[in-house]
């Protein structure tokens, strides 16, 4: 079973409170999501493997550590996931970026796929799938289905806010996936929104309604 972890670092929690506030404007919301994502990238990459290499400093030859193992790809779930990409690239600037596009049908609350563009070597990469919200879990489950169908196997999912219903649904459907969130909220309301949540992350990131 993959792990589930709430990243309760004080800076993450402080910045998350700022974006939860309904009067937080687009500029600040976008900046805070970027900063939270950078902090989350630091936390979720703790188990990336290292190997020894020989280098020469200005003083002497030395054995030091460098990243080993699979290369990295960041995969945002469009469109709101785009807001988390730059934060991850701040920490892992050489990562490739794929895209998975889907929208939520407002009547059924189920996701509908409309776009997939991934690195050609996706099966050989450690994937960090990012989406600010894990509500019903439908979009995340469909994204995992799409990625696994294309050969991906080493996947971590990151969100800012999750509902218990979404966490359960995702872990039931994909028990091998590690799931990280900055907050586990109370429940979903009748419209499928996380309570207390932070509203529609996509609209708040891009200034739309």
UniProtKB/Swiss-Prot annotation:
Allosterically activated by GTP. InterPro entries: PRibTrfase_dom, PRTase-like, Upp_B, UPRTase/APRTase, Ura_phspho_trans. Its cofactor is Mg(2+). It comes from the Bacteria. Pathway: Pyrimidine metabolism; UMP biosynthesis via salvage pathway; UMP from uracil: step 1/1. Uracil binds at residues 194, 199-201. Its EC number is 2.4.2.9. It catalyses: UMP + diphosphate = 5-phospho-alpha-D-ribose 1-diphosphate + uracil. Binds 1 Mg(2+) ion per subunit. The magnesium is bound as Mg-PRPP. It is an enzyme of class 2 (transferase). It holds the Pfam family UPRTase. Belongs to the UPRTase family. PANTHER family: ADENINE PHOSPHORIBOSYLTRANSFERASE, URACIL PHOSPHORIBOSYLTRANSFERASE, CHLOROPLASTIC. This is Uracil phosphoribosyltransferase.
């Amino acid at each position: 079973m993959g792990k589930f972890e709430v990243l309760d670092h004080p800076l993450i929690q402080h910045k998350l409170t700022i974006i939860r506030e309904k009067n937080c404007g687009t500029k600040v919301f976008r900046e805070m999501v970027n900063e939270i994502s950078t902090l989350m990238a630091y936390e979720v990459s703790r188990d990336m493997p290292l190997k020894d290499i020989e280098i020469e400093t200005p003083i002497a030859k030395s054995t030091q550590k460098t990243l080993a193992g699979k290369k990295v790809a960041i995969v945002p779930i469009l469109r709101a996931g785009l807001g988390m990409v730059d934060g991850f690239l701040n920490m892992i600037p050489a990562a490739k970026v794929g895209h998975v596009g889907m929208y939520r049908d407002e009547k059924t609350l189920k996701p509908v796929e409309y776009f997939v563009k991934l690195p050609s070597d996706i099966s050989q990469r450690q994937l960090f799938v990012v989406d600010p919200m894990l509500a019903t879990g439908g979009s995340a489950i469909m994204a995992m289905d799409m990625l696994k169908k294309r050969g991906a196997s080493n996947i971590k999912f990151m969100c800012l806010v999750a509902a218990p219903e979404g966490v359960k649904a995702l872990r039931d459907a994909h028990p091998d996936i590690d799931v990280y969130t900055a907050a586990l909220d109370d429940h979903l309301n009748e419209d499928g929104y996380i309570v207390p949540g932070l509203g529609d992350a996509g609209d708040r990131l891009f200034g739309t309604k």
